[in-house]
Amino acid sequence: MSKRRIAPLTFLRRLLLRILAALAVFWGGGIALFSVVPVPFSAVMAERQISAWLGGEFGYVAHSDWVSMADISPWMGLAVIAAEDQKFPEHWGFDVPAIEKALAHNERNESRIRGASTLSQQTAKNLFLWDGRSWLRKGLEAGLTLGIETVWSKKRILTVYLNIAEFGDGIFGVEAAAQRYFHKPASRLSVSEAALLAAVLPNPIRYKANAPSGYVRSRQAWIMRQMRQLGGESFMTRNQLN
């Protein structure tokens, strides 16, 4: 009887290990491949597209146009760093002080959860994982973030982030956002336009770049101040990000 009970458990354990090994190979290959190859689509884009089809929205198209960092305004990269991750050039994927502050805040305010994800973590999640909050996803995100930080340069992380970030319903990547909202290529985005796009992150479905609320305008102004305090374009050059 004991052997019959152990056999299914052994089978499940081996199956789980094989699945994890397969995922590790898949994600590792993806990290290596996308260190040099443009990203055609992300996990979040696929998730949005499938959800739309399942909901009967057959006209929905998750749209993205890949562009190199040379074809993105330096203000855009600076804007997302100022808004989301000011220690981006310094850390190895995790901003520990920010995480500690977020945990302390969340213990006091369970109804208003604050995140502390870096641009590297957001890139790993958007590219390979799914939306939602769970310890499983955060654990996988941590491993993928370490892989990305080990293999990719900071400039590459920022390039991929800007090309797969969600800026509105079906709008992925800064080129698609620039064309949709400002009718110009991403290379010509101004300081204020870049700050406005960064202001709707990381919740571009709730906050609209084409119909900014008072909160979004206030955040846009704050981001522009932070961009100046970081040093403007010289920050990007100094940290080899453009």
Curated annotation (Swiss-Prot):
EC numbers, comma separated: 2.4.99.28
Q: Reaction catalysed by this chain?
A: [GlcNAc-(1->4)-Mur2Ac(oyl-L-Ala-gamma-D-Glu-L-Lys-D-Ala-D-Ala)](n)-di-trans,octa-cis-undecaprenyl diphosphate + beta-D-GlcNAc-(1->4)-Mur2Ac(oyl-L-Ala-gamma-D-Glu-L-Lys-D-Ala-D-Ala)-di-trans,octa-cis-undecaprenyl diphosphate = [GlcNAc-(1->4)-Mur2Ac(oyl-L-Ala-gamma-D-Glu-L-Lys-D-Ala-D-Ala)](n+1)-di-trans,octa-cis-undecaprenyl diphosphate + di-trans,octa-cis-undecaprenyl diphosphate + H(+)
Keyword Transferase in record: yes
What SUPFAM superfamilies is this protein classified in?
A: Lysozyme-like
Q: What class of enzyme is it?
A: transferase
What InterPro entries is this protein classified in?
Glyco_trans_51 (IPR001264), Lysozyme-like_dom_sf (IPR023346), PBP_transglycosylase (IPR036950), Pep_trsgly (IPR011812)
Which parts pass through the membrane?
A: 19-39
Task: Please provide, in alphabetical order, the Gene Ontology terms of the cellular component aspect for this entry.
Answer: peptidoglycan-based cell wall; plasma membrane
**Keywords, sorted A to Z:** Cell inner membrane, Cell membrane, Cell shape, Cell wall biogenesis/degradation, Glycosyltransferase, Membrane, Peptidoglycan synthesis, Transferase, Transmembrane, Transmembrane helix
Q: Name one GO biological process term.
A: cell wall organization
The protein's location, in the record's own words, is:
Cell inner membrane
Q: Name one Pfam family in it.
A: Transgly
| Pathway entry | Cell wall biogenesis; peptidoglycan biosynthesis
What does the record say about its membrane topology?
Single-pass membrane protein
Annotated Gene Ontology MF terms? pentosyltransferase activity; peptidoglycan glycosyltransferase activity
Query: In which family does this protein belong, per the annotation?
Result: Belongs to the glycosyltransferase 51 family.
| Summary of the function given for this chain in its UniProt record | Peptidoglycan polymerase that catalyzes glycan chain elongation from lipid-linked precursors.
What HAMAP family does the entry give?
A: PGT_MtgA
Record-given protein name = Biosynthetic peptidoglycan transglycosylase
Q: Which organism is it from?
A: Salmonella heidelberg (strain SL476)
